[in-house]
């Protein structure tokens, strides 16, 4: 399934995340892991088309956060609770309504955005760049207006994201 990924990461760490598509069917997000000496996976369906915020019952007040021009917006909740889809809806709103350079940093890429009014650069961790911190630091040299950071789990990434937000960028993350 993940022919574009290096299996050595999975063999070394016992975990990996990736996405793949079956043309005409759907995209899928996969989390693989070892347990009890065997291989396991959790697979989630990601539709090719992004649902409308109203279909997902995302409040208008949340969608208005897309009109912010700097700072940090965190979307929190349990696994499978719609964080990534909510963030994708916010990115799509910016892409549809504003001229901006949007950079998404995700592991794996979930929703694929096409350019509308904005230019959307999508980088997948472990495929296009080494890790979140490296990608975030590099993105700050790529003239972004908006950065979607798929997750923040370590001090350096959080600190760099906060500095980016304080210096005039709009950061979305979980």
Residue locations for each model-derived region?
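Aromatic/hydrophobic pocket-lining residues that form π-stacking "cages" and hydrophobic walls in ligand
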Residues: 30, 90, 135, 160-161
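Conserved P-loop NTPase nucleotide-binding/switch module
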Residues: 108, 140-174
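P-loop NTPase switch/communication element
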Residues: 63, 67, 73, 86-143
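Conserved phosphotransfer active-site motifs of two-component signaling proteins
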Residues: 57, 130-131, 153-156
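Walker A/P-loop
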Residues: 79-80, 168
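Conserved lysine of the Walker
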Residues: 83
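Glycine- and other small-residue-rich loops at beta-strand/loop junctions that grip anionic moieties
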Residues: 76, 125-128, 150-151, 173-174
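N-terminal "pre-motor" subdomain/linker immediately upstream of P-loop NTPase catalytic cores
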Residues: 1-78, 86
């Amino acid at each position: 399934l993940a022919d574009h990924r290096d299996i050595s990461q999975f063999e070394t760490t016992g975990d990996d995340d990736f996405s793949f598509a079956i043309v005409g069917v759907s995209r899928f997000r996969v989390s693989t892991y070892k347990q009890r000496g065997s291989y396991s996976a959790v697979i989630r369906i990601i539709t090719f088309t992004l649902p409308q915020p109203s279909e997902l019952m995302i409040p208008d007040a949340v969608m208005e956060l897309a009109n912010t021009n700097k700072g940090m917006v965190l979307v929190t909740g349990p696994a499978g609770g719609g964080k990534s889809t909510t963030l994708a809806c916010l990115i799509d709103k910016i892409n549809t309504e504003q001229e901006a350079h949007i950079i998404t940093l995700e592991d794996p890429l979930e929703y694929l955005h096409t350019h509308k009014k904005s230019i959307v650069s999508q980088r997948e961790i472990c495929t296009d760049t080494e890790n979140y911190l490296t990608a975030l630091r590099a993105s700050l040299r790529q003239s972004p207006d908006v950065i979607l950071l798929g997750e923040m789990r370590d001090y350096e990434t959080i600190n760099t994201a906060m500095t980016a937000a304080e210096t005039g960028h709009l950061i979305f993350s979980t």
